[in-house]
Amino acid sequence: MRIEQINARALEKVNYDRYLLSQAIAKRVNELINGAKPLIELPKPNMQLTEIATLEIAEGLVKVKEV
């Protein structure tokens, strides 16, 4: 799946609120940096953490709460 499609699906999960999505991605990236395991099987070996977090949100594996 292309990154544009992943971003569109992730935006859909947060009711098209770009600010909320960026905050959720940042929080998940921090969790990954601090040792959390990815919730998805990585489709390519050297994915960036922001790509992993966005894909997890798009797949519905990370729930995003309103701020």
Curated annotation (Swiss-Prot):
Q: Which UniProt keywords apply?
A: DNA-directed RNA polymerase, Nucleotidyltransferase, Transcription, Transferase
Keyword Transmembrane on entry: no
The Enzyme Commission number assigned here is 2.7.7.6
What does the entry list under GO cellular component? DNA-directed RNA polymerase complex
| One Pfam family named in its UniProt record | RNA_pol_Rpb6
User: A single Gene Ontology molecular function, please?
Assistant: DNA-directed RNA polymerase activity
Question: Could you tell me which Gene3D superfamilies the record lists for this protein?
Answer: 3.90.940.10
The UniProt record lists the keyword Transmembrane: no
Q: Which GO terms describe its biological process?
A: DNA-templated transcription
SUPFAM superfamilies in the record, alphabetically? RPB6/omega subunit-like
Q: Reaction catalysed?
A: RNA(n) + a ribonucleoside 5'-triphosphate = RNA(n+1) + diphosphate
Its function? Promotes RNA polymerase assembly. Latches the N- and C-terminal regions of the beta' subunit thereby facilitating its interaction with the beta and alpha subunits.
Q: Which family does it belong to?
A: Belongs to the RNA polymerase subunit omega family.
Tell me, how does this one assemble? The RNAP catalytic core consists of 2 alpha, 1 beta, 1 beta' and 1 omega subunit. When a sigma factor is associated with the core the holoenzyme is formed, which can initiate transcription.
Q: What is this protein called?
A: DNA-directed RNA polymerase subunit omega
Q: What organism is this sequence from?
A: Nautilia profundicola (strain ATCC BAA-1463 / DSM 18972 / AmH)
Top-down, what is the taxonomic lineage of the species of origin?
Bacteria, Pseudomonadati, Campylobacterota, Epsilonproteobacteria, Nautiliales
